[in-house]
Amino acid sequence: MGDPAPARSLDDIDLSALRDPAGIFELVEVVGNGTYGQVYKGRHVKTGQLAAIKVMDVTEDEEEEIKQEINMLKKYSHHRNIATYYGAFIKKSPPGNDDQLWLVMEFCGAGSVTDLVKNTKGNALKEDCIAYICREILRGLAHLHAHKVIHRDIKGQNVLLTENAEVKLVDFGVSAQLDRTVGRRNTFIGTPYWMAPEVIACDENPDATYDYRSDIWSLGITAIEMAEGAPPLCDMHPMRALFLIPRNPPPRLKSKKWSKKFTDFIDTCLIKTYLSRPPTEQLLKFPFIRDQPTERQVRIQLKDHIDRSRKKRGEKEETEYEYSGSEEEDDSHGEEGEPSSIMNVPGESTLRREFLRLQQENKSNSEALKQQQQLQQQQQRDPEAHIKHLLHQRQRRIEEQKEERRRVEEQQRREREQRKLQEKEQQRRLEDMQALRREEERRQAEREQEYKRKQLEEQRQSERLQRQLQQEHAYLKSLQQQQQQQQLQKQQQQQQQILPGDRKPLYHYGRGINPADKPAWAREVEERARMNKQQNSPLAKAKPSSAGPEPPISQASPSPPGPLSQTPPMQRPVEPQEGPHKSLVAHRVPLKPYAAPVPRSQSLQDQPTRNLAAFPASHDPDPAAVPTPTATPSARGAVIRQNSDPTSEGPGPSPNPPSWVRPDNEAPPKVPQRTSSIATALNTSGAGGSRPAQAVRASNPDLRRSDPGWERSDSVLPASHGHLPQAGSLERNRNRVGASTKLDSSPVLSPGNKAKPEDHRSRPGRPASYKRAIGEDFVLLKERTLDEAPKPPKKAMDYSSSSEEVESSEEEEEEGDGEPSEGSRDTPGGRSDGDTDSVSTMVVHDVEEISGTQPSYGGGTMVVQRTPEEERSLLLADSNGYTNLPDVVQPSHSPTENSKGQSPPTKDGGSDYQSRGLVKAPGKSSFTMFVDLGIYQPGGSGDTIPITALVGGEGGRLDQLQFDVRKGSVVNVNPTNTRAHSETPEIRKYKKRFNSEILCAALWGVNLLVGTENGLMLLDRSGQGKVYGLIGRRRFQQMDVLEGLNLLITISGKRNKLRVYYLSWLRNKILHNDPEVEKKQGWTTVGDMEGCGHYRVVKYERIKFLVIALKNSVEVYAWAPKPYHKFMAFKSFADLPHRPLLVDLTVEEGQRLKVIYGSSAGFHAVDVDSGNSYDIYIPVHIQSQITPHAIIFLPNTDGMEMLLCYEDEGVYVNTYGRIIKDVVLQWGEMPTSVAYICSNQIMGWGEKAIEIRSVETGHLDGVFMHKRAQRLKFLCERNDKVFFASVRSGGSSQVYFMTLNRNCIMNW
């Protein structure tokens, strides 16, 4: 059978010159559907030989591709392992229709390898058959590769078998892109499960290349298909598989039954780097291919197998007479199987049916004939009976007709009634719909009117606030000018007034100071403070105060005039947490000129009560300046600490700042106090008439994107050198802290280090109100008399604060691992710094079996690194007396005194850790850690960084204070250096298993609020690890605690509404001690929004923004203080081009607000002022949708630069979409969660490992490998504690937490 088309070159082929197939080939039946047409079983008319005929419509666009395919088939199909090309024909069509091209090729009657595998028991071929088929495929590929042709589509469906078990390749070369023999193309790349990684990379990146060795990878996947019934990843969506193939390790055989030769062959074929993959010639010499039984035996075995499978298929198909292809042919044609080579003549099935029909008709005709003959015989025998019979039949027919007519009329009547009922029902529905529509329109009009009214009201409110801001900004400018004019004069007055011999460490302004010597602004502030004190302060009413003047800022402790005079004239303190009896330090920071001050009504009148934390005047070289033991009792025992609110602006405290003391008979201005359990716990009686300062820190885990150097430079300073025999250690502490803080990010106001205005926070400048620029430069110490009794705690409702200054109080930081109770945690000894965790190292070890009285680092003990001086002032935990309640809801008691002045040794507390619900995560069995220990080295000398404690003159009194130790707990104070044991992070988990999946969590004080699929619970981390159910049958997707606002913000419920719960209401659900709170509604919604996907709380200055991602819009709300006390709409951006999945807000250079959001396409920005939306970064190399993980703003960039994390990558860009670093962060695997933690690092949780990386460079700092794959999810973090959850099969979850080494946090 010759080739009907002449052997011409590609350019010379003329499709119109091809012959018509009529009389040469005829079509028998369809065996498959292709994209461009159908594949038929055909037959040569003269010889009866079978052929596969692909019928395609010829269009002008595809004519060149068809010519190229014909040329390829003619050139390279003459090989024993490639289906032979017989010829091409053109079947002419009427004008206006496309002609049909018939491509005639060798017919492989046994079907494809995929068919064979599917019809095999167990869906797996024997190893001998697999080796034989692989060898034949390799021979065909060797032929193609020798002619520089890449098949590009090796898979089971393109490897066909003949009746004699010969193996033939089909659909190679250009045809792989043009069509699929016996199957249609699903996507532009076909099914990707057999594709090599380099081919996929070439689809993603046009610059990538690949060669003929991509066919070797496809051969390896086909071998797995023959062994296991399907290729790897076949249960996934094709686009998902396309994404995973280049990223996953090479697939392997699942079963262990296969020989080593076979597994080695597959491993060799599936080498991911195609340059290392062997060519076909080498694989033909591979033992698995070379060492085979004789070909005859294998082919006989295969033929028997083919025959058996055909018989099975024949039994299934014996009731089917015709076959037609279906659209799902590519999935199901293998099940149907190939028809037998013994052909049914066309029309045979039709003849069979016709024959059966004729037989049936003959049978019925014979029966009718018999009945007619019987009737004639009866008629002849009895004519009268016959007449009667006819009349009877006639009467019966008449009655039947009447009955039929009656039935028809009845049916018509019923149909008419039914139609009437339907019409009435339809009319009623229309009326109901119209009524509903009218009602909805009325409600919509009312809502629109209400919305307009609210908008006008909010607009008027914002205009009033803006006017107040402008007035106070102008007032602040005038104060700055006055201070600049008077600064030199004040310094001269100070030097004249203070003689060297009379210098004291603390300056007391008493009656001897002439008020005329003060600047005008100081007198005005003093006057306002006095008015507030008289009006608001209950202390002022109970105890008359003398009108002692407040000191001006310029009257500081003696310092060299040169360096100090170069300090910017207007400075502001670090934003403190308002509340009663807080120990505050006014760290001054240059105030930017564009700062928008807060309203005067808040900044001048809401002065918080303050206690004094005094600074030494150690910077003066004059020995007379050293304090003497006769220093005022108010100055003793005070603790200096830096407010470590992550949203505050101040740099680290100056080593030598000025200090002022308010006289003990003058009370500061009084404001509504925050009466929480923390505050009441510190109402303790003190010896010497001095009250320990309280340090409470405000924090919000969602807002920790600022430069850590500004927040962590904790300076440890004594109150008085005269009572400080170990003063040298304090100097060492100061040096150590200074060494562990970057000078460029934490400018310290000292004579040797001048403040630089440009060294500002990385987040856009957050200038505070001028209240802090003025009022909080005065650090006040309020003295208490010795006989003053501690105040009892107020009712539970009072524990929650309504202060607008506090974001969330971090009373605990020992995180439940033997930490003090909440009430005592903030006392100076138990906790002198809001970031105690960041300067001490705590390792909680296995809690199961602990020796009795181990004094050193061991299981069940909390080892806190301290210097010997601090040992003296250690305060142990106070038992709160409520053993079954979490600390966040318990009142606190006064500490008891120990006459010996030392903390007595206690029994080992191993059982207590078990009672708290803590177990070892098993850190040495579940997680294998690989950490670069260099990042966890402390930043100072070889000494450990001590916990700041009260020292000095009040140290003896404080040493006598100890707390009732919680039952069984131990705090082991070990002065030896145990850093070597605690350099690496520790992982622990809570024994409690949650029945449903944990979706989110947030720290509420010391305890953890946990949101699951089925409700909200509180995990008591300070007590026995008990779990309290708060809200049931409601899904909680995301949450944040704002303790200062008494709020828990959530996305919850089936409709994903943004709900705000009141913490006082949640607290009362545990205590049940306030009926008034129970009567109130415990939550409210923010707006009428449904379908919230994500939100972010962002604090700028004193404004708290709430940015919310909805289905196709972003809403921005801002917190409005009293009398509104709610989140109010600020901006709305609807009809965004992409659906926001992740959202954040930045303030560029302290001036421009921008919303940054991530979508499935990339990352985008919206300018808040103009509303313009634009793309920041679109990962064009990923053609499928992406999953955005995190938007992280980099430190020291004024909110302009960020790290965008998505999929398993991260890029550094600025807010205008420009790449700023030639670095792409690459995770080791696809993370399920990515989070920025306070140590200036990012963590990624994957199924196989937890990775810790530097946020600045993407450098890998540490890895925790899981012993088994598990799904982990980040929950929240605070200081050096990171909480995450594991989700097991069945939906059960457990809470883990990782304790990072605190020294690494100080070593930025």
UniProtKB/Swiss-Prot annotation:
Alphabetical UniProt keywords: ATP-binding, Cell projection, Cytoplasm, Kinase, Methylation, Nucleotide-binding, Phosphoprotein, Serine/threonine-protein kinase, Synapse, Transferase
Q: Which residues form each disulfide bond in the chain?
A: none
Subcellular location, in the record's words?
Cytoplasm; Postsynaptic density; Cell projection, Axon; Cell projection, Dendrite
Q: In which tissues is it expressed?
A: Appears to be ubiquitous, expressed in all tissue types examined. Highly expressed in the brain, moderately expressed in kidney and spleen, low levels present in heart and skeletal muscle. Isoform 2 is more abundant in the brain than isoform 1.
Please verify whether the record's keywords include Nucleotide-binding. Answer: yes
- Sequence positions that bind ATP: V31, G32, N33, G34, T35, Y36, G37, Q38, V39, K54
MF annotations from Gene Ontology? ATP binding; protein serine kinase activity; protein serine/threonine kinase activity
Q: Which residues form the CNH domain?
A: 995-1282
Q: Where is the composition biased (Basic and acidic residues)?
A: 396-466, 520-530, 702-714, 773-797
Principal subcellular localisation of the protein: cytoplasm
Chain spans, region Mediates interaction with RAP2A: 842-1308
Q: Give all Phosphoserine modified positions.
A: S324, S326, S644, S720, S729, S745, S746, S750
Q: Which residues carry this modification: Phosphothreonine?
A: T867
Query: According to the UniProt entry, which residue ranges have a biased composition of type Acidic residues?
Result: 317-333, 804-820
Required co-factors:
Mg(2+)
Provide the positions where the record notes the PTM Omega-N-methylarginine.
R503, R511
Q: Which residues form the Protein kinase domain?
A: 25-289
Q: Where is this region: Disordered?
A: 299-347, 363-383, 395-862, 881-918
Q: EC?
A: 2.7.11.1
GO BP of this protein: brain development; chemical synaptic transmission; dendrite morphogenesis; negative thymic T cell selection; positive regulation of JNK cascade; positive regulation of p38MAPK cascade; protein autophosphorylation; protein phosphorylation
Q: Which family does it belong to?
A: Belongs to the protein kinase superfamily. STE Ser/Thr protein kinase family. STE20 subfamily.
What is the official name of this protein in its record?
Misshapen-like kinase 1
Give the source species: Mus musculus
